[in-house]
């Protein structure tokens, strides 16, 4: 249980996600009435990984809420690379599909990077295509990865200044750490990127005005590793029999943080909401 008074420090991802979805719904309605275009998202799932199935369901439910037409493509686990690429090429040519999402991870015999590169950059709703990543690196933020986009949107929504601030990102994946570092640099923050192998991680995290943690290591960040008044985004998630945990020791760290995202209910809903925003943007821009 949280001590009384700490609730105001929580960045409620569900509330902000609803606001974003309301914006998307209005945009979809305007696109349908003004140009006769209904935004469409195609999801591609290979195999029967339970977590991946759940994530796809969440995205389809979000599509229903905002008026995006969603279609699902479930492929058996033994699908070949050629068959996967063939489906992606078909979706690239489908004018009713404005965004394509390849749900990861893929079965081990497949090559995810090659598959993602097969997606037309203008339909890359997840923002993972090298073309879109390259644009991000030179400051052209069109389609960017959804989780980093959600973090930036939350900072804007809570009026957290970024320019000149010390930002520390723990985790250097292509999905979160690297693109988010570029987005912070584009906003003139001073950025340090660390990971679980960084020597003396605490030395870096203690200096963070804004701390983003995305490692998947349960409670990696303790209260003595953050400074008073830091803004903290917990992107990691660890599922155990007794519950779901983030990378941050939430109950203790919140006592020092100015703002912090919970797990669950923090960054996750924002990621899905930003995906909806991206699909709308794809439809508005390319058709």
Swiss-Prot record:
It comes from the Archaea. Keywords: Amino-acid biosynthesis, Histidine biosynthesis, Hydrolase, Methionine biosynthesis, Multifunctional enzyme, NADP, One-carbon metabolism, Oxidoreductase, Purine biosynthesis. GO terms for cellular component: cytosol. Pathway: One-carbon metabolism; tetrahydrofolate interconversion. Homodimer. Catalyzes the oxidation of 5,10-methylenetetrahydrofolate to 5,10-methenyltetrahydrofolate and then the hydrolysis of 5,10-methenyltetrahydrofolate to 10-formyltetrahydrofolate. This is Bifunctional protein FolD.
